[in-house]
Amino acid sequence: MLSLLSKAVSLAILVTAVVASPAGNGVEWSGGGTTTVTVTASSPTTTVTQSQCSTGDQKCCQSVQNSSAAGVSSLLGLLGIVLSGTDVPVGLTCLPIVGGACQSQAVCCTDNSYGNLISLGCSPLQL
């Protein structure tokens, strides 16, 4: 149990470091077991409206960065996620939008299956 708690705390610290340092620090992580994910996303500059967000999960993310950013790619590797595309917008520390308000970055993402930690294939969302 302590090991699981230790991993959770380490992962939370890594996410905080990625969000605080978009350029990354050049550290490479490798995770055990991989999951290949195919993400089809709109162009990162395309803004969608709430009615155009067909995934059903509109998120408010603390940060949205490109999957090729060093810190983001390290986090994906640590989680065992291998994206089949490059330059996929990744939302970090994302929560569901409640009451139509978001104080950070409102996005519509194609893959929200990783809890509140990350969302994949994110496009800016106009509230």
UniProtKB/Swiss-Prot annotation:
CDD domains: hydrophobin_I. Keywords: Cell wall, Disulfide bond, Glycoprotein, Secreted, Signal. GO terms for cellular component: extracellular region; fungal-type cell wall. It is found in: Secreted; Secreted, Cell wall. Expressed everywhere in the mycelial tissues of developing fruiting bodies except for the top parts of the pileus (cap) and for the prehymenophore; but high level of the transcript is detected in the parts surrounding the prehymenophore. The keyword Disulfide bond applies. Transmembrane segments: none annotated. Self-assembles to form functional amyloid fibrils called rodlets. Self-assembly into fibrillar rodlets occurs spontaneously at hydrophobic:hydrophilic interfaces and the rodlets further associate laterally to form amphipathic monolayers. This is Class I hydrophobin 1.
